[in-house]
Amino acid sequence: MVGSAIVRELERQGYTNIVTRTHTELDLCRQDAVEAFFAQEKPEYVFLAAAKVGGIVANQNALADFMYDNMILEMNVIHSAWKNGCKKLEFLGSSCIYPRMAPQPMKESCLLTSELEKTNEAYALAKISGLKYCEFLNKQYGTDYISVMPTNLYGPNDNYHPTHSHVLPALIRRFHEAKESGATEVTCWGDGSPLREFLYVDDLANLCVFLMNNYSGDETVNAGTGKELTIKELTELVAKVIGFNGEIKWDSSKPNGTPRKLLDVSKAEKLGWTYKTELEDGIRLSYEDFLNNPMRAER
């Protein structure tokens, strides 16, 4: 999702010498394949957006896989970029790197100040490792490797799998299927109280290209809107966009996840960037993408 959005943004801005690889074409967990790719292509600027991702269920059921796969692919790409003289690399992490009870909104400086959220600790530790490896290469070898920490993302090419997707695409699929089947109610996990922030993926892509051209530094840059809503409010908004008119119930025996996740985006704003897509508009665009690409629901 993120990689394709960055390609769209680069093309929109007139860039033409763009090299991409799908997972089928290049397995980033294979060190030999990654090294061969960098030795052959010698990319000067690298956006590292690839990751093994998933929602609460996937993270809880595959802790070791999430940590191993993400650490391996990150280290393979970042190290091969350094070995082959890459001029600049941009590493994309996640807001889950910040402590569970971090002061809100979360500033970049609160990294590693207290305990992580247990439901996605493995993924968070892997992302922190990638971020720190970029920082240490900068300090030891004078590289220009930067990192961006996005809030919850959504948009075209999202993963709508019923158990392995994040909350917003999962809600889109559930309410679409409920509407199509004529269901009178939908039950959601938790109690709907957690506060979340959402950024349309094309807005993130715009920031990524902006930072590649305008920012250098060891400290990461938060990517978000600076606006939040409860999961209950999000659920009602998705139901409204899709046209589901039944009852929404909550199963409080299921986990809520982190109680609040709002990024402080003042750093990005001071650099001259702000988001463009409001949440309801983005959900409509995402639902159109879901309807136009039904096979995505099978992933």
Predicted regions and their residues:
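Alpha-helical structural signal
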Residues: 74, 150, 168, 172, ...
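C-terminal substrate-binding subdomain of Rossmann-fold SDR/epimerase-dehydratase oxidoreductases
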Residues: 5-9, 13, 177-299
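Glycine-rich "substrate-gating" loop/helix at the edge of Rossmann-like oxidoreductase active sites
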Residues: 119-123, 151-166, 190-202, 225-227
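N-terminal Rossmann-like NAD(P)+-binding domain of SDR-like oxidoreductases, especially those catalyzing
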Residues: 1-159, 285, 292-293
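Short aromatic-enriched loop/helix-cap "lid" or pocket-rim segments at secondary-structure transitions
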Residues: 101-104, 158-162, 234-235, 260-261
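Short alpha-helical
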Residues: 1, 54, 166, 229-230
